Amino acid sequence: MYLIVAYSIAVHACYLGSKIVVSLYALQLGASQTAIGVLAAMYAAAPLILGIYSGRLVDSTGTRWPLIGGAAVMCAGMLISVFGHGLTALFATALLTGAGFMFFNVSIQTLTGGLGDKEQRARNFAILSIGYSISTFIGPVSVGLAIDHLGHAGAFLMLAMFTLPPIVGLLFSRRFNFINGEKNTDKNRSTLELLRLPPVRSVVIISGLIVAASDLFAFYLPVYAHTLNFSATVIGVVLGVYAFAGIITRFAMPLLLKHWRGERVMFACLLFSACAFAVFPLSTNLYYMLAIAFWLGLGLGCGQPLSMMIAYNRSPEGRAGEVTGLRLTANNVARVVIPMVCGALGAALGAAPVFWLNAINLTAISFVVWRQ
């Protein structure tokens, strides 16, 4: 399990770090906030199409080759911007990185959920989510330092190197070709059947909106901080503090789940996060910004692991990978639509309304969660 988490940390750090260097490099090239929003949406364009297919592929073939292929495609995406220049290269990087991470992420979550019984599954997802938090710290901080000291091409090269240990390790080990239960090879099953199940449908929608809020913070914080003339290193530190708070929350999550249902914990965390989003753009002081980023990390830190665990528990037998792919497809619908809307909003009114829109979004879905 710990080797799985180590590979996940490396690939997730590459994914998150690329979003920061792509947005900052685009700003340096003179891109508008609308263009930044389209770039953010490009990360979700291929996953939007491939999400359900990737889940079916994992259910039918196992997890090993989708893990290898996903990491390799991400490496190729980074190398495009090492050797290419301009917005065209950045769009290609965003497209390939999003596609590769989709296959890797569906596989790693299916593999994690398939290890052990239901009680062990909760522990495994908690460990995986801690890994995600660690990579959320490593990615932004390392890429901020790399941009300031090595330039944008150097940062992309560093991120490409993050993907190499998982690729090499998985190529030489067959331990990770795992699926929970019998391989599901029924070609006639319909994904619409899953959406007709209210427990699955609700967690899919909620997951998409939670991830969109988290991703928008990672993508629009650099835009907002850039207007305040913060360096890439400082921006990385702010995102690192946000990630560190998520690590704390995820260590505490098993204790919280012993006393309250997952849905109640998620309700409290989402409402807590909404308050942080509402006040974030009111501060231009770095120390206040660090404090609010920590506050936000405490709230959002539980959202994604809880949605992963709840979705897996609600999956029909033999279709866990497909439900994971469906959930990630919903995540990417939100990642396409919301960044483009927010990009246009930011171009017209500035970055602050983007944060306030997130606050409204999280408040609304927190009460949807409360009703379940």
Model regions and ranges:
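Helix-breaking motifs and short loop linkers at transmembrane-helix boundaries and internal kinks
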Residues: G62, F83-H85, L282-T284
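Cytoplasmic helix-loop-helix junction between adjacent transmembrane helices
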Residues: L95-G131
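Helix-loop boundary and gating motifs at the non-cytosolic
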Residues: M1-A44, R201-S202, V211-Y224, L228
